[in-house]
């Protein structure tokens, strides 16, 4: 972190305290002594509640505890309403500290009658420590939360639409499954080395070579491999529907002839390794199922337009869209960058200004990870971003700064594409990918039935600008007709999908012709909420 010292002529630091203007106006209108503040500190079982006026004068001398059940929450509403009538309160605002998910039933109950504002735990901590250093109790927390609401630190949180809520749950379940599978593979690598030392190093991509895994699982030791001839290994692989070149098998047997001795618990390690293989296969099936659902949700939102960017695939676009949420929640692209924390921390005091610290903490880590995953793909597969990155490396930029700058740049591009529902004219789109083709190929390769895939493509076509529909349909037809086998789509499935293309093209063209400009502008995601699970 560099320190810049000057004569006070540097960039000034703005005071960024934001006051809740609407709340202050309501207080001025009726008076602070007639405006109530209810603060709630929730836990897993109970909610601690305290009530004051806007000047901080207690209405309840002591806090009250309510179990988080339906009946007790109704009692809490009645008690609060009675206190408002007894003390002549004309208005009330509720402050609830965010606690994962435990505060949600309380929030749903209270917001049916009063305005609810959320308080970040960091705010409670910062307002608690100066007044009560070294003391952390429910009562001290409630006092700090009361000061937070009065000072204007309560936030109005928008609830995600049901579509985005389900989409986000599916994406996070997939990420968790991928992480568990990754850790299991790392453990399996070590166990494999325990009973077959050095075998895993014979293959560059062990987990992408089913025949190598089958040999290790079936034989389980170098001595058994050495006692088996090459023809027998070939026949056993063929019986399992697998194949391996004879030179590779000979290389495996050569390793077995000179392999180190296994650990004393080699047989047990082999059994545990086989059990972990079953878990990895199960997680793989779960991940595939989640990715099918991601495809369905992506097709129903404008985020599907991001598939036109080389380097952005269905999974990364789906993860990005689920974490960003409705694009209408953002006034400008910098709001996405700020929510993800894609800017450096800063320390400034007098003439000392450390403006290039690490990325700020306390932001949405899931959104940041989704953006960074796309950045890694863009560096590998997008010519524009490859050149942009290489030029900065030549100028001596650190890789961290390059990645953050690329993430900011991508968020700006994505915002214009999604918010404007257009195929943005940008150098990174000089070799634009066909959106409908990329979506259809991914769906077919992941086992979604051809007819369901065509329904998804039809929904995705409704997100395209009218001027791009014709060229997208042509690219879809040409792409499926000349699709290489390396894409992973079975030949029979591909033929069935090609037979459905004429009816799909007619359906989309008819929808585009019958859709006027006003109808197109009013097109929303809501009509498709109920069909997502069916399409998935």
Regions found by a protein language model. Name each.
Residues 1-536:
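A detector of single, family-specific signature residues
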